[in-house]
Amino acid sequence: MLKAKWQFCDIETAEDLQSMAALFKATTQLAGAFDTETTGLHIIADKPFLFQFGWVGSDLNGYTFAVDFEQTPELARTTVIEWHRLAATLPVYLAHNVKYDLNMLTNIRLPYYGSNLSDTMFYIRYAHDARRPEDGGPPLGLKEYASQFIDGSAKYHEKLLDKEKSDMAKGFNNLLKTKLQKAGCKPPTKYAAKQYTLSVFEDMFKDPVFTADDLPEDAKTVYYDWLNNDIPIWLQNKITSIVESNMIPYNKLNRKELHKYAHYDIVWVLESWLQLDPVLTARDNRLGVEIENQLIQPLVEMERVGFAVNKEYLDNAIPLVKSYILERRQHFYMLAGEELKIGQKVRIREILNTKFNIPVTSTNGEELEQACSEIIRSKISNDYDRDWYAIDFINTLEELRTLEKWYATYMLRFQKDLKYADRLYTTINQVGTVSGRVTSDFQQFPKDTLKTVDGVELFSPRKLIQVSGGEYQAIVYLDYSQIELRFQAMYTILVGHPDTNLCRAYMPFKCHNTSGPFDYKDQNCIKHAYNTDWFYDEQPEKKWVKLDVHGATTKEAFGITEDDPSFKRLRYIGKRVNFANNYGAQYKKSC
């Protein structure tokens, strides 16, 4: 339910701007907000075409305004400059995903540097229990949050725009289908279709290594004719298969409806704040939001630096990896006795159960690793050859999963991003996890070299990223060892319920030396935690040693020692399970 009464206004003339400024000066503001509608999502290459802003007053009257850069460019710039001046006086100035909008304003040389910035996502995180949405926690999406907690119709205008984008994409795609059918093009027999349909095309391009150049010659000719002559220039560079609705930028949609959508974004931001701010106070979590606020501008600056890359190296590596994937698929088909995709989990499980006599219930990596380990240790069957074929089948499956993920998720994506800029850029999410950990879309970027089974290097991420920006000769990688588990151990102490085993993994907790007991608050104890002999309080003759928590989990789960040849590989699974549990994963997802 809305707390404020709202008025909307599009700024179309200088008089509209003057009226807005006069109204601002005549009201007492509780909070303000801003947002941008942009040509795309690239934080450097894209630009805003619509700027919307507003405030809510102490009398709970709210006002939203929008100005269009494409329709009135000079007025729009003047409006943003004037609004920046006014916004600097607000008690709090909000956006939803504020760093993105700050990047957009910087892209048009209208940056905002006020110290009153905040983000509604901070308020959502700190005013709710730390739970994921599937576990009863709040969604972080603005419209998702508003529709759940403020107004059930909050997604109305978004749905209208989504439908318009979907209809536009469908129109382009139907044109391709018609051209293919008129040309008499027939899809390959394995697709079991008499003529090309959109579902056939989608099936073809689901394969991460499939491109338009892999189409049959007649279909390829029609496809490129469609791409070059029927698709607008602003859309051509985004297409790798058929047109998807998310490729249609907002500035190509119905302007009147878009303005309504923009106004309501300000409403949902400020209504969310009105709901959440008193809860934040009641939970005594305001300090957390203040700390997050101080990080906004430094993180924006970090995001805008980007990574210099060796584009030639990437362009050369992509066909190498593609060729190797195709080669390994043939080996996988030979082992399976049929052609199948790595995503056909049910069929793969049937092959493991029947052909190789391996009783697995799923094809997730952990269970397959355990099956391999079991074969090596005790032999599931007495058929030596079949056992090693089974291991080869599982290893090839896992290898292909890695190869295809690297190829599609990273290599092709990077190549696409480099069409718009000469560097790779990442966004940093301050509240992306319920644990409070900072995340980014580069977080899972591979660090190890991608090699063939014979050890031939295919692609090295470290060779992709180049040193730049100063008199440097190397890239330094810094990593805190198991930092979250260390914090979790300390947290159990601070809340008065110490987890003795977890604490002892990292510090001589409830231990002593010749000088006395260990005190985690004592700087001298901390300084000598690892270079002095400490002994357990309950077993004074037994010396304390640090514990590898991930290794301990691995040994317990797989029944192996550190000398086992599989230990290093399986330890990675132990690590994943530990962190999954730390993030609140349910039992079935951890096992």
Predicted regions located by residue number:
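Extended, well-ordered alpha-helical scaffold/bundle regions in very large, multi-domain proteins
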Residues: 287-393, 582-591
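Phosphate- and divalent-cation-binding pockets in alpha/beta enzyme and binding domains
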Residues: 101-104, 351, 487, 589
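Acidic, glycine-rich two-metal-ion catalytic cores of nucleic acid-processing enzymes
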Residues: 2-14, 26, 33-42, 46-48, ...
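Conserved catalytic core of nucleic-acid polymerases
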Residues: 245-251, 300, 304, 359, ...
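Secondary-structure capping and boundary motifs in well-ordered enzyme cores
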Residues: 250, 254-261, 286-294, 320-324, ...
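Active-site-proximal helix-loop-helix substrate-binding element of RNase H-like nuclease domains
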Residues: 2-12, 42-277, 363, 372, ...
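Short active-site oxyanion
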Residues: 87-93, 338, 472-475
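Core structural elements
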Residues: 233-248, 260-277, 282-309, 345-356, ...
